[in-house]
């Protein structure tokens, strides 16, 4: 289902099992931009909505990419459910539903960009989707370590019956028991499980780390890549950045530039990101960001009026 809109970004709704809905945003390639072989799916980081990636979508669109974003079920954003019921498996279910929906629309060639916690979901999903390439940015490779850094305590070390009701993540209440039980039951929690997911990866893969990231160990990212049997993977560092890639405009622009270069390179079957890009103006990025926030608020208000 497609919602009519006066905005450049197109809102779609996927209906999934249990009468739940996943909102998907589509940004078409800029007119007269270079032709690309692949679309790009963006999986936002934890507690980040689609509109947080408005600027990146503009960069990619300006450089010829058809961009797809989505809000996971039981997450912040427009899709069904609340974040206190979010699990890694629900995140994976949401990604697979979006890929299935793209297939019905004959969008079969796509690369993936996943950041932070969503990268761990992407790592576990690649064997079930036919992606052309993968780009991650400050991606979790050791979920237990990263959660301990983010939450201030290693909650996955506790017995289930000793967990608090909720875990506070940047002001959002994550359901402790349901999240921890899913992590432990389905093997999401450590570096070894990530290596197991990625060992036989046979598509190009670029991992961006941040040299001031306190949530992800760069040496563990290197360990992950060294265990991938393919030689089509490479690591780059976003210098001057912490885990928060939007902490200032310099860091944010470097992130947009680097990911766009990686997408162009990998669309051309290369790992060297020394390529030229076209950059949107600051004014253009500001307009896109404001318009997407307005669009999100309108959709939220429509949902409230119908409830």
Swiss-Prot record:
GO terms for biological process: bioluminescence; fatty acid metabolic process. Belongs to the LuxD family. The active site is at residues 116, 213, 243. InterPro entries: AB_hydrolase_fold, LuxD. Changing residue 79 to T/A/G: Loss of activity. Its EC number is 2.3.1.-. The gene is luxD. This is Acyl transferase. Keywords: Acyltransferase, Luminescence, Transferase. Pfam families: Acyl_transf_2 (PF02273). Pathway: Lipid metabolism; fatty acid reduction for biolumincescence. Acyl transferase is part of the fatty acid reductase system required for aldehyde biosynthesis; it produces fatty acids for the luminescent reaction. One of its GO terms (molecular function) is acyltransferase activity, transferring groups other than amino-acyl groups.
